[in-house]
Swiss-Prot record:
Organism of origin: Pseudomonas putida (strain W619)
Name used for this protein in its record: PqqA binding protein
Top-level division of the source organism's lineage: Bacteria
GO molecular function list: quinone binding
Swiss-Prot/TrEMBL keywords: PQQ biosynthesis
Functional summary from the UniProt entry: Functions as a PqqA binding protein and presents PqqA to PqqE, in the pyrroloquinoline quinone (PQQ) biosynthetic pathway.
Pathway(s) annotated for this protein in UniProt: Cofactor biosynthesis; pyrroloquinoline quinone biosynthesis
Similarity comment: family membership: Belongs to the PqqD family.
Length: 91
């Protein structure tokens, strides 16, 4: 089954994506704690706004990083993990 790139990701209520100077990186805050995101996840997370679909996020990052193979696959994998961990909804 293929991933539907027309879905629009949004952070779940209670989850907040932000830059945390003490962590020297982006984090995802939620009521039970915090997750420090790696650079790739931070770039993707910064584009999750509840308006852009996954295709738009892929297009944006492919333009920022031309010639980087598998950008789309990496974004799909992030979306699957984030949904599985209940960080985001996909509608």
């Amino acid at each position: 089954m293929s991933f539907d790139r027309k879905q629009v990701p949004n952070w779940r209520p209670g989850y907040r994506f932000q830059y945390e100077p003490a962590q020297k990186g982006h984090v995802l805050l939620y009521p039970e704690g915090m997750i420090k995101l790696n650079d790739s996840a931070s770039l993707i997370g910064g584009l999750i706004d509840g308006k852009r679909d996954v295709n738009a996020i892929i297009t944006e990052l492919e333009q920022q990083f031309p010639g980087v193979p598998e950008v789309a696959d990496d974004i799909e994998q992030f979306m699957e993990v984030a949904r599985g961990e209940h960080w985001i909804t996909l509608a």
